[in-house]
Design a protein with these regions (language model features):
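C-terminal hydrophobic structural anchor segments
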Residues: 361-396
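Flexible loop/turn segments at secondary-structure boundaries
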Residues: 82-85, 149-151, 190, 221-225, ...
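Short, conserved catalytic/metal-binding motifs centered on acidic residues
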Residues: 29, 60, 75, 95, ...
Length: 433
């Protein structure tokens, strides 16, 4: 490799070069999933055919978010990249002010319709996700959780007190594997598990019957109706029990344990587990619990053992396997953090509640598109990676658009880090027409 000389002249060109030429895979996947048609049929806000249409407004936001640009201002970056707009099939990209004003016109009905579009898009990817999870894990992990979306300032409609005293909204979401299948953006001040039954029903409809589902929940979902729903669907489940009130009767039952009651669940014998049986107040039937006794925090031995309690649906599996499956919840918690971090969805951009609600639905669709690219266009080795890798190594790859013999051609550099992934994705598009 030759050394770059120090006296390089910097100049500019009119050639069609984009730092995000990998966006073509987003637009092609959106085309295959009928996203434009669904948005066009569901969202009718604009009254005049002037400027960007409803569909172009939303697609501009979705594609901007899918690149990890979570601020409304970032849509201006998209609008100035004409090559990227051409690859995405966008004729008119709104500036950030127009887009903000447009989101402010959403009401409950249009927000609900946009949420349905997101669910419809997820239903077109979920089969691939379920197949992969069954192949690699032997079961389909489902995770439902709520997270606080904090805001600062006095101009956020519907923001209220959160569990930690801060002000903000609640975002409740359901994931199947790494796919964000459904969500509810809610006003602050409510319960973290509000509308969990609706999320469960929508998730169950998408997953379908006949799959070995393992649903995982935090303490907020330690409720009889949640466990009953899972039993009715023949889902396995595990729920963390962290409230001191709920743990008290379980601790009392442990007083009769002897050392032989504990079973080692790791190779070095630093963790043991045992089954407990208890009927919580208000529940009709006795429930099965697993208690985990940990002697170490990393490599540091604890002065006293730490006990973790988990409500479980099964006792026919080895204790080590049950604990392993429940701890996989952490991986899906990270999947939930993925859109918030990598799509930069931590900060609601609008002052009105429904505008922010629409914004997070667009964020969900962006995540679904990224997972669809990952599962349908990339090789299997890419499935284990998070969406951050897809954004950085596929979407944000520079390319040059050229026209020769009346045909358009997109050129990527052969020095791209994930060149094989790009080649595989291009071959998939070519073979599918």
């Amino acid at each position: 490799m030759s050394i770059i000389p120090s006296n390089i002249e910097i100049d500019f060109t009119d050639e069609q070069i984009s730092p995000s030429a990998g966006s073509i895979f987003l637009s092609e996947m959106a085309k295959k999933m009928g996203l434009r048609e669904e948005l066009n049929a569901a969202i009718k806000i604009k009254k005049r055919a002037r400027g960007s249409s409803d569909t172009e407004m939303l697609l501009s936001l979705i594609y901007s978010l899918a690149q990890g640009d979570g601020a409304i201002l970032d849509v201006d970056r998209l609008g100035h990249d004409q090559t990227r707009c051409q690859l995405l099939g966008l004729h008119r990209v709104p500036n950030h002010r127009r887009l903000g004003e447009y989101l402010g016109r959403f009401d409950d009905n249009t927000c609900g319709r946009l949420e349905k579009v997101a669910q419809s898009q997820a239903s077109k990817v979920i089969e691939s996700v379920v197949e992969y999870e069954r192949e690699t894990k032997g079961y389909v992990p489902v995770f439902i959780d709520g997270t606080a979306i904090e805001v600062t300032g006095d101009y956020f409609e519907g923001a209220g007190k959160l569990y930690d005293g801060n002000t903000g909204y609640w975002l409740h979401a359901a994931f199947v594997g790494g796919l964000w299948v459904t969500q509810r953006f809610q006003k602050g001040g409510g319960h973290v598990a509000h509308e969990v039954k609706d999320l469960l029903k929508e998730t169950a409809e998408m997953v379908g019957e006949g799959h070995p589902v393992w649903a995982r929940f935090d303490n907020a979902y330690y409720r009889n109706d949640v466990a009953a729903f899972c039993r009715e669907r023949k889902w396995d489940y595990s729920i963390s029990v962290t409230s001191e009130t709920f743990k008290r009767p379980l601790r009392e039952m442990m007083s009769d344990f002897i050392e032989e009651d504990w079973e080692a669940i790791n190779d070095d014998g630093t963790e043991h587990a045992a089954f407990l049986y208890h009927r919580p107040s208000g529940w009709k039937q006795e429930q099965v619990y697993v208690v985990v006794r940990s002697m170490y925090e990393g490599k540091q031995r604890l002065l006293y053992p730490r006990y973790t309690f988990i409500l479980v649906s099964r006792e026919d599996l080895p204790l080590a396997e049950i604990v392993k499956r429940h701890r996989g919840k952490q991986g899906q918690e990270n999947v939930f953090k993925g859109p918030l971090i990598h799509l930069d969805l931590h900060h609601p951009p609008c002052g009105t509640f429904n505008a922010n609600r629409a914004f997070y639905s667009a964020g969900q669709i962006a995540q679904i598109l990224l997972v669809a690219v990952q599962m349908k266009l990339l090789p299997k080795e890419a499935y284990k990676h998070g969406i951050r890798t897809v954004i950085r190594d596929i979407v944000r790859v520079a390319g040059k658009l050229v026209r020769h013999a009346r045909k358009w051609k997109l050129l990527f550099s052969k020095s791209a880090l994930r060149l094989y992934w790009l080649s595989h994705a291009a071959d998939c598009l070519l073979s599918s027409g």
